[in-house]
Amino acid sequence: MSETTTVETTTTTVAVLVGSLRADSLNRRLAEVLRDQAPEGVVLDIVDGLADLPFYNEDLDAGDAPAAAVALRERVAAADRVLAVTPEYNGTMPAVLNNAIDWLSRPYGAGAIVGKPFGVVGATPTPYGGKWAHADTVRSAGIAGATVVEDVLVSQSALEVDVLTDAEVLGRLTGAVQTLAAYQPATSAA
């Protein structure tokens, strides 16, 4: 009699929010490279439609939320993790990303990102590499209830290197994706 061993494989799905709407966005292309190079067992789902979201307004969210907001919430709720890939605009995160986080934070206490591991990476053509956008996105996501994974920390200046082809930068970025995918929240002893 032969024994068969079954290996259980799990897939971790990461919803990716790109903070730029530009057609040839560096961060959109970066998200696509990360998706294509995702580690085995990790699926990066780039969430489109952020441009279709109206600015968050609680009056719009009473009753029937806009279709774009419902679609965003469903995609993120279905994911295991969230990754923001964002540039920096005028020293902060882009309004489109902030607006998406606002929609995902509601209903209060039960939004699609509440308790969900959340990481932030990005590239920007500034000398500071998007550090301020990174900090603002981390703060906003954390206040909205996400579990920010602090070890997912890559803000890169696109002035220094080609972030889409530089092996060291791509290694740090794919490492950040691996860290986010492998993150296990600390459990408290009862």
Task: Please provide the spans of the model-predicted regions.
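Short, glycine/serine-rich, charged loops/turns that create anion-binding
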Residues: 21-22, 51, 60, 108, ...
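N-terminal beta1-alpha1 ligand-phosphate binding loop
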Residues: 9-42
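N-terminal beta-loop-helix "entrance" segment that forms/cooperates
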Residues: 49-66, 160-163
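A general structural signal for well-ordered alpha-helical segments in protein cores
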Residues: 14, 27, 31, 53, ...
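Helix-loop-strand module that forms the ligand-binding subsite of alpha/beta enzymes
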Residues: 64-144
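Short beta-strand elements in bilobed, periplasmic/extracellular small-molecule ligand-binding domains
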Residues: 41-51, 55, 147-156
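Glycine-rich phosphate/pyrophosphate-binding loop and the adjoining helix
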Residues: 2-6, 10, 147-190
